């Protein structure tokens, strides 16, 4: 059995998401609104008929071969036949290996050998099967070669013509011959074959500027080129040419047997030869004109040769009436009319186009064609006539499906035909099936089973993947999850296997996340993934495994067989050009691109967009853009104020293009608030509270200044605390034997008038609360001090343990304290000139006279040792 090397495209037509692929050519513009576009210079990719079978004419008993070639190797070829003897009958598939038909296949070429018989005459079609997809060729006619005479084999009397020299003679010797195919002609004079002056005279002997040497007996013979049958016409012409001097003057006129007018039918593109009959004496001159065709004579394709007008590469616009005027100065002038018909084979200028259609929707497809005669339009749905479909209606050039059903999914072809041939174009019709809910039990009372709670949500599988070739070793898969209310999907896994015996499914390592639980279209949510490390020239199947939130999984249906062709066997796809990356928002950008030629749209099914942050060297994110007409696409969500790099490639059902050049773009920065906060008017002061965005968007220099100032303030505070602590530690420990209360009293001395101006006097007090546990000991110390009140106070010399520097420091502190007290005492006249307050008793402290106003307390330096005993009491609080 032949290996099914290319069951491609092979898309699951009921659920896959694809674009239309034409069989022959497709209009580059959208069919619904475009003017008649020019046809592309090369055929479109995908499934198409490269070479359709050609019509043949053959004699009975001959064997002919019909050939059909497709762009890709199908799973199988079939041929259908409609006999010419059964009018109105449909096509029937031929059984191969029979006596009258033998089918052979070699790769993507199929050959049908037919023995020409009466029952094998008729129309033939080639049908290629690509999985569920059926592509049908145009019709080839097999006709029987034949040659006959319209008037029978009756003998005609020879014509006798006598003309003066210098005239041109036209004899239509083969006007009664009917031949299929057109006969080839041979001309004879006096039994000797002569070469015609013009090619394409089609059974007309034309002699220009005759002389006496042209006299003789003329005859002609028709030969059927297919069968080789020859017909010797019985009629002949006896021509006698007389010298011009002997002829009398005579106006232009027609000879016996020459037609009064002519009607010629010619195929577009052929050469047309118009001959003007008539003679006169003297020989007339000929002038050509046409009331219907502007510039019919004076153009580059027309040439006047004597009495003949030759038009090369005939066009439809050349059809009309041509008049040749013959004038030799003798009235009347002879006018000869020739009616020209130019026929044109059918050509579809607006092919059908179908998008993904929901089951049950109404679909209207248009197919417009040109041709002369006006072509007839008919439709095939997966190889079956639309006339047999109850949902189909034909209206002028439209096919209307009132309700699209699943059986309509596949290839829809439009055919235009006239007697010159056929032309076809098609589109892929994809049907999105309705979601079928599980039927609920009806009738009776539903009793819940034990351990049965509320109805669980279903697991809706993804659609079968659509496969596109990326390279010789990789493909791109596209699938979607239809809208549903079932269990949410967490991730996808891709599985594939090579077609063949004992080939197991392989699972890729990548986990494809479902993303945000929202639908990105009315139909559902689309996904893409690539599969690498494949082998070219092998056939694969793919499927998608969905993992749900309940940790269960469900598989999609498998894709149709996909044959991975090497890139050398495919035509290159047009590469899109990225024009601009538009900053759409803080989380989105819009890509804008173009094609080198809009005529390339018919080659494209859609586009793949790849993007990643410019600072990243990881894999690209992918987005699929459906439709060949797209020129922009929004990509979201993205990071705010982030630079990304983008690239594009176009794809069809068979392959993908090269990547476009990389282009960078970024998302927008966060927008600052333009709303002012309410202000409180206080005179001319501006007390407007800055908004959050204004504070957040503070300039870096200002932020650095504020931060540096805060650090300096903290350093200053820390330094002051350290200095104060060191001074406090130095001042404690002057007298180790002095009680704590007495020490505090000695530390504060009265200064009568510290300030020279006494505008405001305040009484200040130091309130000391002692520990109750040390109250008795403190009272004993106070009584002891009271007994020593009358004794003179002597300053004890300072004693230091080991450091003489401490002694010098204490002496300096004492001298500074003395100078301070002297200045304070000098300002008070009641001190009797004694500024040395060191002789005061300890009882003169502020604790003894707390109510006396106008007193200022200053701390006195202690000269005792730094070690002090605080076990006698603890200081709880100090009040000023």
UniProtKB/Swiss-Prot annotation:
It comes from the Eukaryota. One of its GO terms (cellular component) is cell surface. Residues 665-678, 688-697 have a biased composition (Polar residues). It is a single-pass type I membrane protein. Residues 823-837, 864-880 have a biased composition (Low complexity). Glycans are attached at residues 102, 209, 466, 557, 693. Residues 725-880 are cytoplasmic. The chain crosses the membrane at residues 704-724. The keyword Membrane applies. Disulfide bonds join 68-126, 173-220, 276-324, 367-414. It is found in: Membrane. PROSITE patterns: FN3 (PS50853), IG_LIKE (PS50835). The keyword Transmembrane helix applies. Changing residue 10 to L: In strain: Tai18. Pfam families: fn3 (PF00041), Ig_2 (PF13895), Ig_3 (PF13927). Gene3D superfamilies: Immunoglobulins (2.60.40.10). Belongs to the immunoglobulin superfamily. IHOG family. Homodimer. Heterotetramer; 2 iHog chains bind 2 hh chains when facilitated by heparin, heparin is required to promote high-affinity interactions between hh and iHog. Mediates response to the active Hedgehog (Hh) protein signal in embryos, functioning upstream or at the level of patched (ptc). The first fibronectin type-III domain mediates a specific interaction with Hh protein, in vitro. The second fibronectin type-III domain is additionally required for in vivo signaling activity. This is Interference hedgehog. The lineage of its organism: Eukaryota, Metazoa, Ecdysozoa, Arthropoda, Hexapoda. The gene is iHog.
């Amino acid at each position: 059995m032949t290996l099914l090397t290319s069951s491609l495209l092979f898309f699951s037509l009921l659920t896959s998401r694809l674009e239309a692929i034409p069989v022959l050519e497709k209009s580059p513009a959208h069919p619904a609104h475009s003017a008649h576009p020019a046809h592309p210079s090369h055929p479109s990719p995908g499934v198409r008929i490269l070479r359709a079978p050609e019509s043949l004419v053959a004699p009975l008993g001959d064997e002919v071969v019909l050939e059909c070639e497709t762009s890709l190797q199908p799973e199988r070829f079939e041929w259908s036949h409609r006999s010419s003897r059964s009018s109105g009958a449909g096509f029937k598939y031929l059984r191969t290996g029979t006596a009258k038909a033998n089918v052979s296949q070699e790769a993507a070429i199929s050959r049908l050998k037919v023995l020409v018989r009466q029952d094998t005459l008729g129309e033939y079609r080639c049908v290629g099967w690509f999985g569920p997809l059926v592509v049908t060729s145009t019709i080839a006619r097999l006709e029987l070669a034949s040659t006959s005479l319209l008037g029978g084999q009756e003998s005609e009397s020879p014509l006798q013509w006598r003309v003066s020299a210098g005239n041109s003679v036209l004899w239509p010797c083969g006007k009664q011959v009917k031949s299929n195919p057109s006969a080839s002609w041979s001309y004879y004079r006096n039994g000797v074959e002569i070469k015609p002056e013009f090619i394409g005279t089609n059974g007309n002997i034309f002699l220009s500027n005759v002389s006496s040497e042209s006299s003789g007996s003329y005859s002609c013979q028709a030969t059927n080129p297919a069968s080789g049958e020859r017909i010797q016409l019985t009629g002949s012409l006896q021509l006698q040419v007389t010298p011009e001097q002997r002829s009398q003057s005579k106006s232009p006129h027609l000879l016996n047997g020459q037609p009064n007018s002519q009607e010629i039918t010619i195929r577009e593109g052929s050469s047309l030869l118009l001959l003007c009959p008539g003679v006169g004496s003297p020989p007339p001159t000929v002038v050509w004109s046409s009331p219907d065709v502007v510039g019919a004579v004076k153009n580059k394709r027309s040439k006047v040769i004597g009495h003949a007008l030759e038009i090369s590469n005939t066009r439809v616009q050349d059809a009309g009436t041509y008049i040749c005027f013959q004038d030799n100065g003798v009235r009347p002038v002879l006018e000869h009319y020739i009616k020209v018909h130019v026929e044109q084979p059918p050509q579809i200028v607006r092919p059908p186009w179908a998008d993904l259609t929901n089951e049950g929707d109404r679909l209207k497809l248009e197919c417009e064609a040109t041709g002369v005669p006006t072509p007839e339009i008919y439709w095939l749905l997966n190889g079956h006539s639309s006339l047999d479909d109850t949902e189909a209606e034909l209206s002028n050039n439209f096919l209307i499906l009132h309700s699209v059903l699943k059986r309509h999914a596949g290839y829809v072809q439009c055919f235009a035909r006239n007697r010159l041939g056929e032309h076809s174009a098609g589109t892929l019709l994809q049907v999105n099936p309705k979601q079928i809910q599980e039927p609920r039990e009806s009738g009776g009372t539903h009793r819940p089973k034990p351990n049965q709670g509320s109805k669980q949500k279903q697991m809706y599988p993804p659609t079968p993947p659509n496969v596109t070739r990326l390279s010789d070793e990789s493909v791109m898969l596209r699938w979607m999850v239809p809208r549903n209310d079932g269990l949410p999907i967490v991730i996808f896994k891709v599985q594939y296997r090579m077609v063949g015996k004992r080939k197991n499914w392989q699972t890729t390592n990548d986990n494809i996340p479902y993303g945000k639980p929202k639908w990105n279209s009315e139909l559902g949510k689309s996904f893409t993934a690539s599969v690498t490390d494949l082998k070219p020239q092998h056939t694969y199947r793919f499927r998608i495994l969905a993992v749900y939130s309940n940790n269960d999984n469900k598989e999609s249906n498998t894709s149709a067989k996909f044959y991975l062709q090497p890139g050398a066997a495919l035509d290159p796809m047009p590469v899109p050009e990225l024009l601009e990356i538009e900053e759409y928002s803080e989380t989105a950008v819009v890509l804008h691109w173009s094609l080198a030629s809009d005529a390339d749209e018919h080659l494209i099914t859609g586009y793949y967009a790849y993007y990643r942050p410019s600072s990243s060297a990881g894999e690209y994110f992918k987005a699929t853009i459906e439709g060949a007409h797209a020129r922009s696409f929004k990509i979201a969500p993205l990071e705010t104020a982030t630079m990304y790099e983008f690239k594009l490639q176009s794809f069809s059902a068979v392959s993908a293009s090269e990547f476009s050049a990389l282009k960078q773009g970024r998302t927008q920065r966060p927008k600052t608030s333009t709303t002012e906060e309410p202000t409180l008017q206080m005179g001319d002061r501006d007390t407007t509270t800055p908004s959050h965005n204004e504070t957040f968007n503070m300039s870096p220099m200002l932020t650095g200044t504020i931060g540096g100032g805060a650090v300096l303030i903290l350093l200053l505070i820390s330094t002051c605390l350290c200095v104060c602590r060191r001074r406090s530690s130095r001042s404690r420990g002057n007298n180790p034997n002095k009680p704590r209360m007495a020490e505090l009293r000695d530390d504060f001395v009265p200064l009568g008038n510290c300030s020279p101006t006494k505008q405001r006097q305040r009484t200040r007090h130091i309130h000391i609360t002692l520990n109750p546990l040390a109250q008795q000991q403190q009272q004993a110390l106070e009584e002891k001090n009271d007994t020593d009140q009358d004794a003179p106070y002597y300053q004890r010399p300072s004693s230091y343990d080991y450091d003489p520097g401490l002694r010098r420091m204490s002496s300096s502190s004492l001298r500074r304290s003395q100078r301070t007290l002297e200045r304070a005492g000098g300002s008070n006249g009641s001190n009797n000139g004694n500024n040395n307050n060191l002789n005061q008793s300890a009882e003169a402290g502020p604790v003894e006279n707390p109510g006396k106003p106008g007193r200022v307390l200053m701390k006195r330096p202690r000269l005792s040792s730094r070690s002090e005993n605080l076990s006698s009491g603890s200081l709880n609080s100090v009040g000023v």
